[in-house]
Amino acid sequence: MSAHVPVNNVIPFSLVDGPGARCSIFLQGCNIHCAYCHNPETQRLCVTCGECVRACPAHALAIDAGAVTWDADACCACDTCIGTCRHRSSPRIRHLSAEELFAEVRGFMPFIRGVTTSGGECMLYPEFLRELFALCKGVGLGCLIDSNGTIDFAQHEELLSLADGVMLDVKAWDDDWFVRLTGTDGVMVRKNLAQLSEAGKLAEARVIVTEGWNDPEDAVRGIAATVGSRVGSTRLRLMRFRHFGVRGKMANAPSPTDERMASIEREARDLGFVEVVVS
């Protein structure tokens, strides 16, 4: 049995995380900290401070043997614990093996077409993903990875051979913007973009459109230049920034207008992108 990894959430049926109905799996932990993260509770592991335990109105949380425990049956899903946590974590994490998680996924068949792993950053657990994907492929389920692209996919060829593709976030193209948004540079993201495209594993390139926090037009141009002649077969998703769930310095940042989104879409199509999704 594989090692147990922290699982933040499992959504049995999703229509926005790849083609068809899919099971979306969110693993806990992230190696960057985006200013616009709308799931900040997936970033870090619990430090057992106990603040959520004291705040829980349903008394569904407790500290046992030095760890926070969660009673799913008692939980009223009010998210008070998420709002209380100052450490960008969640007490509702489950530690599961690939086999245990696959048993849950299999229960959703035949109503799903595949699974999509996300986070946090799911590529922090490549061996777990490899084992999970092998199990899923064995029963005919497709497998997609939703990644921030800061971990080198070239080091995980076996995992990539099992995956149908990677939905890759391109948060910014210029490193100054990238550092401002995430605290790190985008060198590995650009490398992964090129290699995934060449290998036929780039399921989708994703660009968040913000007002004043990145240069999405520059990112779209950078993606087009990198994929080159494959631009016409590269799916591009332009995602409008929304402040829901965001904490910190971008909590009250404005969303781009419809006109701005339409303008970037036109530029993308002028660059040769055919499938451009605006969301």
What do the PLM-derived regions correspond to, one by one?
Residues 52, 61, 66, 90-112:
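Fe-S ferredoxin-like electron-transfer domains
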